[in-house]
């Protein structure tokens, strides 16, 4: 099943969502982006959407990002994006990404441009029926983000490390970090 996402003011197939190094220089090279990640339940209903929007918009504000859309507009766009998808077989993951665009100074650190909004839809992980019978194994990985309130790609290093150390190398089903 192909999913539809929202990228830069239009709906497109998820596999066509991309960031251009020049257009999104601050996001790709400088890490000037924030995101939140949530799931759907009960045939496409987002879980804790208001909480996630408050968090991602609060993170954007703390990074002095210019966000063109209001919370209510983003909430509506999330629902519009979900409406582009089918939920008769599988639930989905939703990533709301605010990605920095082009710098305006020679240091390539400052911009007065609004961030690009992405609402990326991917399939949720499916567990086998045996997983529901026997349970799943959860491996622990100790990691403390430098800033516990701010969720950016560079603060997500612990998650990447946990997946490799706990899930891949220690053969757990999931990692808690």
Where are these predicted regions, by residue range?
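Short, internal active-site loops enriched in acidic
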Residues: 99-104
